[in-house]
Amino acid sequence: MGCYNTKKTGLGSMKKCLFLLSFLCVLPLCLLNAWWRRFPAQTAVNPSSFRNITILLWHWPNGKSSSLKRDTCWDLYRISRCRLVDQRSLFPSADVVVFHNRELALGHQKLPLDLPRPQGQRWAWMSLEAPIHNGKLHQYANIFNMTISYRRDADVTIPYGQLLPKEAEGHLVDNVPLNKSSLACWVVSNYRKHHKRSKVYQELKAVVPVKVYGRWTETPLSQNALLPTISRCFFYLAFENSISKDYITEKLWRNAYQGGAVPVVLGPPLGDYKSVAPPNSFIHVDEFASVKDLGEYLQQLAEDKKRYSDYFTWKHQWTVKLYKDWRERLCKICSHYNSLPQEKVYSNLEAWVKG
């Protein structure tokens, strides 16, 4: 019986037919909706992620420039859509303008405050120095939108070094240097009696022998001799010249880790080191009640081959990565650009730097 055969159907049959037609129309929509809901919701995409980000370096750190030919960030570091330039004529089109603080602090460079600043352009303050060496920063209130620093809480973190996972684990016999002839050594050029590291050294050398190299003792080491010399020491004094948050320099990454000596560290708190270095890969001065206790521990450890070798276990899984090229640090900005707040401004840069 068809729905439109009105001769043989009454009002009740007509209602049934209309209900059936409605059901048949709605059913496909329900099935389509159920199928569509299997897929995750699409998030909004930042349009800037589809275009090149231009990073303008206003002046090269320490006056030492590097080549920016072709697509530097992609060719050297496989960072895409990142254009690194140093021509000031490109200021109007730059997404980020980077200023290295040392040249500003010394008065060798100035901020281009006289130029009309394009809408949306971000200015980045960059420094690898400890706060005490950054000079006065109060005049930079409400100017910078971004910080580039070794600090882990910076907008773009550029450490002196870090540990990266190895593709394949190594063998312990290959990881522990065997040519040890000195208990402890220290390479220092800038020696100041009032520095904490100088006071610790004076106390430590009364307990254990410490060989000292560097301009301070008029026994400087060439770059070629540095690591081979350190490799002959059981321990290396990786003492920072400033006790500041996250300030961990090449003294740990290059001198100690790459040199093949167990680092005895003095710098930021123990927690800062634990955040970036494997456990049982370093010895922190603050872990001991006195420098005398530290010295006695070093003597005992050097005599215990098994316990000493445990401090090199990290080399099974990790390898040291040093950051020495400013281009690599600058290209890293593009990896963070789209995730940073667009309207961020440092109202008190000095407070952040000293924080």
Which residue stretches match the model-derived regions?
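Pol beta-like nucleotidyltransferase catalytic core
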Residues: 2-125, 135-253, 257-355
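A short, histidine- and acid-enriched strand-loop-helix "catalytic/donor-clamping" loop
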Residues: 129-132
